[in-house]
Amino acid sequence: MTDTPDVQPPKIEFPCERYPIKVIGDAGEGFSDLVVEIIRRHAPDLDAETLVVRDSSKGRFLSVQVLITATDVDQLQAIHNDLRATGRVHMVL
């Protein structure tokens, strides 16, 4: 039997400029605006120029990606929690 070392996710050094957040949810009116509004609560420096919105191949889902300056783990967790609380978000990457 061989021992495998615990695999750890890469460490993020804060503040982390241009940190990508990708949100996938049901396509529908106002989804991208909702995502931007929630993220902007926690990252007021969100640059709308970095916003990328894509439809899924069948049009059922949308992905919304933005870049923020991540300040700490608590900020990222708060963004994740608020997005998931909407009931419209399936994944936050």
Swiss-Prot record:
According to UniProt, the name of this protein is: UPF0250 protein PSPA7_1111
Task: Give me the Gene Ontology terms describing cellular component.
Answer: cytosol
What family does the database annotate? Belongs to the UPF0250 family.
HAMAP family from the UniProt entry: UPF0250
Q: Name one Pfam family in it.
A: DUF493
